[in-house]
Design a protein with these regions (language model features):
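Membrane-proximal intrinsically disordered regions of secretory-pathway and membrane-system proteins
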Residues: 2-4
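Active-site and channel-lining beta-strand-loop segments
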Residues: 15-20, 26
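Acidic/polar, low-complexity surface-binding segments
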Residues: 21-23, 30-72
Length: 72
């Protein structure tokens, strides 16, 4: 498997900050939403426990996008 085929690893910290371990930068839910739209795979792990929290973060992205579109 080539490096480009591997999902990007995102770590979520207790302060709710999201860290892209591939680019060594903090990202936002909007950034992750853009990754979804581009078809870029990623996994989100809780930085403290190592638990896979990708599903809950994806749900949060959908929820926030629905709220922002409903507010218009």
């Amino acid at each position: 498997m080539a490096n480009s085929d591997r999902p990007t690893i995102i770590e979520k910290y207790a302060n709710r900050r999201l860290y892209n371990t591939g680019t060594y930068t903090f990202v936002t839910l909007d950034d992750l939403g853009a990754m979804v739209k581009r078809g870029k795979d990623f996994l989100v792990y809780d930085a403290k426990t190592g638990a896979d929290i990708t599903r809950s973060v994806l749900a949060q992205i959908v929820f926030e996008q629905e709220n922002s579109h409903g507010a218009r």
